[in-house]
Every structure is written in structure tokens, then in C-alpha cells.
């Protein structure tokens, strides 16, 4: 039994229908621009709903301006009290000027590197026969990246976790330490207040940078990092450059709950 299929006739859209579509598309685009955050003025305030707004100081201001307009916490006051000066360059920095690496300055039988590993890591395992001194394994949430990380002692693995001088030795040399005697410099290089177990690649990225040129990629650690630098500079009576102080002030001003570490 045969049948026939009726073909629909295609109708060319009228000029009016094309015009209506163009107008509708334009209106939708205009609404998106007006109300979606990042596209336009965000008239609905969607970008600020559900999250507190963080207001950072104006980086165009001086350190003194930033600090004077901030909540007067211990950290803010300590940054404000740091003396300003220029880098000293009478003689170049050398690591040997700060004594042997990781000396046992506290005479507890363990070198400073292993002392810091034991302090900063958890689930620590030590090598038998070393009086619980030589750390062979540990784990921690690494502060500079915020990631979980393990330490395993070995020729190819030990360097993945390094001990950082929060205030770099060369920075200290240029801001006052060049005037110290050898014993004071060795004490500074092994001061636990200025030492952190950190990700090796982050430490290499930092090198001898100050706060004006380097901060950890983990923004959640910025407050504690600057607080540590401030406490170290204060304890050892080191000065800061103008740029360094402004960077430290900008961070400190945004950290009303950050205490100043005890030395």
C-alpha cells in the first residue's frame, strides 16, 4: 500500500523576525554585561555576595602612611619601628662569614638542620644509632606552597625539603650583620626563629630575596612569613630598605589577627 509524504515548504524569515532576534540578542548581552561579575559594573553585587571583602592598602602609599592608617597590632607596630637604611656593600657576602653550615650551637648533640626537621615535621623517623638526631623521614603541610609533602633522606631526595633562612643570610649581611663578629653571625645562621623546613624548589626560587621581591606562593602564609621576618629583624637589630619596609607594611596591615612571634 503506497503513501505519499507531504513536503514542508521552507519559508524565508521575514526582515522583521531577523530584526527581533538581533534586538533580543543585544538585550541579553547588555544584561549579562551589566550584572555578571568581571564583565561589567556588577550591578547586582554578585562578586561580593557570600565572601568577605578584603581591602588591601594602597601600594602607592609609603610604609609610614600604610602603617599609620592600619589597626595598631603588635605586628604593625613592630614593622613601623624597624629602622630604614640602604644595603651595605663594603665587602661581598660569602656563606663562610656565617660559620660552618648547621652547627650544633645549642650543644644538644644534633646539628641545627636536623633540629628544625624534627620541629617542623610530623611522623618523624630517625636513623638508629644517631641518638635520635638524624631524621630519615617526616611529613608536613609545607608552608610556602600549602601542599602536603614528605621528607625522605637520600642522595636524590633530601634536597626536596630544605631549611630556609626566613631573613636570608645575604640580606642580613647587607643590613647590619657585616658589623658583627664571627660568633654572632654563626648564632644568627642557626637561630630557630629564622629557620623553616620548606619546599626545596620554593627555597631556590626565593634565594636571597626580601619581602619586596618575593613572597610565598601560598598567600595564606604571607602574614606569618612577614611576621617572622619582622621578629627576626627586630631581635637582631637589622634594618630594612625603603622598598622592603613598604612591602612588609602592606602585608602586616592586612593581618589584624597575626601575632608577632616570640624570639
Question: Model features per residue range: what roles?
Answer:
Residues 75-79, 113-117, 248-251:
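Generic structural signal of hydrophobic/aromatic residues within well-ordered alpha-helices
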Residues 1-18:
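N-terminal Lys/Arg-rich, disordered targeting/topogenic segments
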Residues 37-39, 44-110, 242-244, 257-263:
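N-terminal module-boundary/linker segments of secreted carbohydrate-active enzymes
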